[in-house]
């Protein structure tokens, strides 16, 4: 299946507590990878418009960890995790936890596919520990955050 450049597809698997996100970008894998691994770029696009973001720690290497906080007038929303595998321009495997629900840990895998002509297909999967956790994740506004975040990433990649 091929998605259009601006379409973000978010699919919940009916058989396992997994969410799959697919998006294409008008940039080569090296540039998309850097935007995911350089904290100075990441802070410019991750999450929905209207939230401020700060990165408390970010060590993108196998065994490294991260913590970042989104904030708005209603409060702060902190996230953290550990990197398990990082392959430049190809793959990132990490855990992901929303600190407001620390028992809900997801295993995330981000794969970058070179489509040629300076384009990349990103496929991200998040395997959550339960259907309840996955459904709460989806109901949390995650779709808005992902779609708006990738729109913001388009802007960063165009620079």
Go through each PLM region and give its residues:
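A short, structured loop/turn motif at beta-sheet edges
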Residues: 29-30, 61, 84-90, 112-121
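Beta-strand/loop substructures that line and gate deep hydrophobic ligand-binding cavities in soluble
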Residues: 18, 93-147
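Short beta-edge strand/loop motif at the mouth of beta-sheet-based domains
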Residues: 20-21, 40-76
């Amino acid at each position: 299946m091929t998605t259009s450049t601006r379409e973000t597809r978010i699919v919940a698997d009916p058989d396992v507590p997994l969410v799959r996100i697919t998006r294409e970008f008008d940039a080569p894998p090296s540039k998309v990878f850097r935007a995911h691994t350089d904290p100075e770029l990441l802070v410019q696009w991750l999450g929905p418009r209207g939230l401020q973001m700060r990165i408390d720690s970010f060590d993108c290497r196998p065994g490294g960890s991260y913590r970042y906080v989104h904030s708005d007038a209603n409060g702060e929303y902190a996230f953290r995790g550990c990197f398990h595998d990082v392959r430049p321009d190809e793959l990132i495997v990490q855990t992901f936890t929303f600190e407001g629900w620390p028992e809900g840990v997801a295993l995330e895998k981000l794969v970058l596919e070179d489509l040629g002509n300076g384009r990349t297909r990103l496929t991200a999967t998040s395997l959550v520990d339960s259907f309840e956790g996955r459904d709460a994740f989806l109901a949390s506004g995650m779709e808005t955050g992902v779609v708006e975040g990738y729109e913001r990433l388009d802007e960063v990649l165009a620079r």
